[in-house]
Amino acid sequence: GAPDLYFSEFTNATGWVHAGDKAIGGRLVKTDDETRLVAQLWGAVPEDMAKLAVHCKELGFVGIDINMGCPDASAVKAGGGAGMIRTPELAAEMIAAAKTAGLPVSAKTRLGYSLVDEWRNWLTHILHQDVENLTVHLRTKKEMSKVPAHFELIPEIVALRDEIAPDTLLTINGDVEDREQGLKIVADNPGVDGVMIGRGIFHNPFAFEHEPATHYRDELLDLLRLQLDLYDKHSHLTNRPFDTLKRFFKIYVRDFTGAAELRDKLMHTKSTDEVRALLAND
C-alpha cells in the first residue's frame, strides 16, 4: 500500500530566498513520477513564503502546506514552526502569502504552545483563514512527543471545524502508527477526513500496507538496499553526506537474530558500497 498524498520535508522559505537551493539540502527535489507531492514550508517572512510558493508551483508540487507545529528549537526561535502559535496574525499573513501562488494551501499545527487548553482559540483562528486542509498534531509544542496524543479532543475539534469552516478538510496526526490504526481513527470519529503518519514510518516501513503481515529479514534488508540505490541515484541533487543515511539503518536492521551486531558494523561504514558488501557477506 501507499499513501494517498505525500509531503516534502519542511523547508525554510527565507533560507531559500537568500541562498537558493544549496540552503535547503535537496528538500524540494521532485521527480516527474511524484505526482501527489505537497511542499511543506515554514518561515516567518510572508514575502519569502510567497516567493518559494511560486517556485514550488513551477516545480510541479500539487499544494503548499505551512508547518506551524514543528517544535524544533531553531525553527521556533526564528518564529516558524510552533513559534507561529504565539504570533497568530503573522500566521494568517503567511497563509495569505502562500495563497498568492495559486496552489491549494493547508496548515499543519499543534493544539497549542504550552497548554492543551489553547487549542480552541488557536484552531479557531486558523480555521478562519480558509485553508484547504488543517492537520492537527494532538499535542502541544511543550509536550513534544513525550506524552500520549490527546485523541479525546477529536470530537470537539471536528465540531469546531464544522461550525467555522465545514469545507476545510481535517487530518489527524500524532501517535498514528499505521494505516490500520488510521482507518480506525477515521471510523471512530465521523468528520475526520484523514490521518497523517510521520514518525510511524520509522518504526514500521510497511505502515501503509492494506493487510498487515509479518516481514522477515530478507525483505527488510532488501528495503535497505533500495534506499541505498535511491541515495546514490539522487545524491547529486540532494548533496547530503553519506552519514545522514545511518539514522535509517535501525528501521530495517531489527527484529532478527544478529540484528544488533549487524547494525553496529553498518554504523562504521563510510559508503553505500561498504554497506552493500556487509549485507552481501552477512
Region locations from a protein language model:
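Glycine-rich, positively charged N-terminal anion/phosphate-binding segment
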Residues: 1-58
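Short glycine-enriched, charge-decorated loop/helix-capping segments at active-site entrances
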Residues: 79-85, 143-144, 212-214
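Alpha/beta catalytic cores of nucleotide-metabolism and tRNA/nucleoside-modifying enzymes
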Residues: 119-123, 127-133, 152, 156-172, ...
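Conserved beta-strand positions in the central sheet of alpha/beta enzyme cores
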Residues: 6-7, 40, 65, 106, ...
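An active-site metal/cofactor-coordinating segment within enzyme catalytic domains
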Residues: 21-22, 28-31, 73-84
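Short gly/pro/ser/thr-enriched loop/turn and capping motifs at secondary-structure boundaries
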Residues: 13-15, 72, 142, 201-204
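Short secondary-structure boundary segments
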Residues: 9-10, 68, 138, 198-199
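Alpha/beta enzyme core
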Residues: 50-64, 68-78, 89-170, 189
